Structures are given as C-alpha cells and as structure tokens.
Curated annotation (Swiss-Prot):
The protein's name: Alcohol dehydrogenase 6
GO biological process: retinoic acid metabolic process; retinol metabolic process
Tissue: Liver.
Annotated catalysed reactions: a primary alcohol + NAD(+) = an aldehyde + NADH + H(+); a secondary alcohol + NAD(+) = a ketone + NADH + H(+)
Taxonomic placement: Eukaryota, Metazoa, Chordata, Craniata, Vertebrata
Coiled-coil segments: none
EC identifiers of the protein: 1.1.1.1
Residues engaged in binding Zn(2+) 1: 47, 69, 175
Cofactor: Zn(2+)
InterPro entries with a match to the protein in the record: ADH-like_C, ADH-like_N, ADH_Zn_CS, GroES-like_sf, NAD(P)-bd_dom_sf
Taxonomic source organism: Peromyscus maniculatus
Residues holding NAD(+): 200-205, 224, 229, 293-295, 370
Residues where Zn(2+) 2 binds: 99, 102, 105, 113
Keywords linked to the UniProt accession: Cytoplasm, Metal-binding, NAD, Oxidoreductase, Zinc
Length: 375
C-alpha cells in the first residue's frame, strides 16, 4: 500500500537537550513539498561530529532534534519539481548540499555550496520542518537527521547511487570516508612517490591513509597515542606507525629526521588545535603541505609560529574532502561497488538504531572506528 502523500509515523533517535542520551521516539514525517524528497533510511553511520555535538549547548535552541548526518536509503516519494531522483531509487544523503547554481557550485575550485547556510538552522527549508515529535517541531541535524526510519530532505542534499550499491556499507561514504579520502586526493593532491604523515587514526584518519595510498605515496607514517589502532592503520596502507609518547623529543623532530627534512604532506585529523602546529612543523620546510581535516570549534584560535611559513610551507583546510557532493559522492559509491577500495576495515560495528547510545559509547571509548546503525 502506497504511503505517498500521507504522514508516516515511525521511530527516530531524538536529542531533547545537550548532554542527554538519545531517546527512541515516535515521530510523524509529513509528505515532501516542492524540491524535497522523503527517504526510507536503510543505514546510518555515526560520525565523530555527531558525538561532539551531543554535548554542545549551542544545540539547545534546536531541540528536539534528530541526530546523524551520514546515511543511505531508498526514495519513498518526491515533492513537486524533483527531477534528479524518483521513487524507488537508492540514494546517499549529502550533509553538504550542491545546488549547482550558486557561484561556489559553478566554480570548479570550490565545493562549499551557499545553501550550506541552512545547516545551522537544522531545517530542511527556510523556517520549516516536515517532522514532529510529541506535537513539537523536530529539527534534523545539519538538515539531515539520519538516525531515523524516514526523513524529508532537500533534493540538493540527496544523490542517486547505483542499483547494486551496498547501502549498509556505503553510508559512511557520505561524510567520514569522503572527508578523509578526498583530503589526500583533492585537497593535498598527494603525488606518486611522496611521503605522508597522518595524525589521528579514527575513521577519517584511516580514510586519509587510504587516499594517500591510492594516490601512490611511497611512505605513509601513521601517528597516534593509541597503539591499538596501529594494526588497522597498516591494513589500510600505513607503512609505519609511531606513538609520540615513545620519544623524548617532539614528534615533529622525530618525523623531520625520519623523512629527510619532513614529510611532503601531513594531515591533522585529531581536531586538536595543538596538533595543527605539530603537523605543520612535521612537513617539509620548503614545499610541505599540511591539511587540517579534523573539526575545530569555531571559537578556537590557532597559535602558530610564523617562522614555520617562512621557507614555503602551506597550511590549508579541507571540507568534505573537496568533493562536489551531488556529482562526485555517487562516483565514490560506484568505485566502492567496483572494489576499488574496501570499507570493511573502517566499519567495526553494526547495530540496530535502538542501540544508538551503546554505539556512541563504543566510539567514545575508542573501541569502535565506525559504527553503522540499521533502522
């Protein structure tokens, strides 16, 4: 029996106030309006950004809110004017939209669509939500809210993927994998035969290593204080792994010595502001490129010795790996389907949506790299 045009009652993981655990709630999901798509979720990945945001007091005005921003699903129905997807299509959710019309989208050098401005409202459109919980307007984290059985999302924030795509694994491509892999491929432009150092070995850091390997790097040194992550790092392509706590001298000096005046490319993936200067100092003094991949809070000020730039180092940022999302994320899914890379080492746990708090705790404790939730 078709549900198109009808309100769908289903379950979602809802945050009622920052710092509280998520609760499974019944929600009502209204039909999509113009340029909107209603998606039956198949899988959702938990990203470190989700976990950081759970305790962020700035999220309070947007509660109740459905968390999650990585996901895949099947189109249940579409609103008027939708042309890029249709009912029954397999899709991936895009936490960074691509409208295809703004100056940024039309510029080949940029990927941060101007419609990303809605992300801070946590609404799918200007001032509106298609979801309610206990009669209250319910927000969707970064306009997505993938920890739900159904969501309504703007057409520019969803992309069709191949019919044979394995949605239960491909869900992490929408943010975590794309962010790390693209930081190496697009943002740093790692070159064949180069040397790389990656600081932080979570899911995104491991994806950076995979990107460095795919680009042909000759030497990839993984850096983390948790040695339990080293085996996985080597599985995805690290040639060496080091723990800064094992050395008496600063880790940047260790890497400088190991790589003949520093690495060609370094990546900061911990989200720790102090590590940014360390990563910058670890890259080659003349031509080294350091990419900030880890998410830093907007109020954090970086304190970096200006002399590090004197001889030619470059420090740059990277958002979602530099991908034009609606165009290029589906291509990554196709590459995964074609076995050009393997996501299995990244997905260490798969749980049902009602176990979301257990999954979050596993990630907080460092026992899990990436967890996939199945509604």
């Amino acid at each position: 029996m078709s549900t198109a045009g009808k309100v769908i009652r289903c379950k979602a993981a809802v945050l009622w106030k920052p710092g509280a655990p998520l609760t499974m709630e019944e929600i009502d999901v209204a039909p999509p309006k113009g340029k909107e798509v209603r998606v039956k979720m198949v899988a959702a990945g938990i990203c470190g950004t989700d976990i950081k945001s759970l305790d962020n007091k700035k999220l309070a005005p947007f509660c109740p809110i459905i968390m999650g921003h990585e996901g895949t699903g099947i189109v249940e129905s579409v609103g008027e004017g939708v042309s890029t997807v249709k009912t029954g299509d397999k899709v991936i959710i895009l936490c960074l939209p691509q409208c295809g019309e703004c100056n940024t989208c039309l510029n080949s050098k940029n990927n941060i669509c101007k419609e990303v401005r809605l992300s801070g409202t946590h609404l799918t459109s200007e001032g509106n939500s298609r979801i309610t919980c206990k009669g209250k307007t319910t927000y969707q984290y970064i306009t997505t809210g993938t920890f739900s059985e159904y969501i309504v999302i703007k057409e520019i924030s969803v992309a069709k993927v191949d019919e044979d795509a394995l949605l239960e694994k491909a869900c992490i491509i929408g943010c975590g994998f794309a962010t790390g892999f693209g930081a190496a491929i697009n943002s740093a432009k790692v070159s064949p035969g180069s040397t790389c150092a990656v600081f932080g070995l979570g899911g995104v850091g491991l994806s950076v290593i995979m990107g460095c390997k795919a680009a042909g790097a000759a030497r990839i040194i993984a850096v983390d204080t948790n040695k339990d992550k080293f085996a996985k790092a080597k599985t995805v392509g690290a040639t060496e792994c080091i723990d800064p706590q094992d050395f008496e001298k600063p880790i940047q000096q260790v890497l400088f010595d190991m790589m003949n005046d520093g690495a060609d490319f370094t990546f900061e993936v911990t989200g720790n502001p102090e590590t940014v200067e360390t990563a910058l100092a670890s890259c080659h003094k003349d031509h080294g490129v350091c990419v900030i991949v880890g998410s830093l809070a907007s109020w954090i000020q970086l304190n970096i010795n200006s002399h590090l730039f004197f001889s030619g180092r470059t420090l740059k940022g990277s958002v979602l790996g530099g991908w034009k999302t609606k165009e290029e994320i589906p291509k990554l899914v196709s590459d995964y389907t074609a076995k050009k890379f393997n996501l299995d080492p990244l997905i260490t746990h798969t749980l049902t949506l009602d176990k979301v708090n257990e999954a979050i705790q596993l990630m907080k404790n460092g026992q899990c790299i990436r967890c996939v939730l199945l509604p």
